[in-house]
Amino acid sequence: AHVLVAKALTRTEKMLCAIARGLDIVNVSWIKTMIRKRERIDPKAHVLRDRNREHQWSMSLPDVLSRSQDNPSSLLRGHTFYIFKHTEPSRDVLTRVIEAAGGSVEHATGKTDARVLASDQAHVIGSAADETAIHALQSHYTKAHGSPLAVYTAEVVLAGVLRQQMDWTSTYQLSAT
């Protein structure tokens, strides 16, 4: 597929994967216009606009699509995400979104090798439900590296792919428990 037709801007797996891959995202008027004119119409003239959601999520869909179309499936290229079991949305959904953005995914446990996490391009994603395993991994990492391990919520991926701009600050870090 090269085009996603939508009535509204959402943060669904389908929408995020389309953004990550640099697909055109259009409103329903694109289809109606093509039916009326009986010819293919450039989708760029019918880019979806949802000003309320764009404002809510601090982004502009046309700007985001421009960035993603310049370098499709590249936002997370070279990045590996170690994802704990109880993350929401599910590890499967996050995997598809991350892979659409060019990244890769591994399963994280309390016994994940701390050496692989030392890279600037290795990121851990977890949730409060994984607290025991996260604590074990953080302890292991701190002993090996002398510094704390940042663990992010899934929001780092969802918001980053939505905006086509990653935020590795503490904004999306899982709070210490």
List each model region and its residues.
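Short hydrophobic beta-strand segments
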Residues: 71-88, 124-126
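BRCT (BRCA1 C-terminal) domain core and associated BRCT-interaction motifs
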Residues: 1-44, 88-177
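Conserved, structured regulatory domains from eukaryotic proteins
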Residues: 17, 24-80
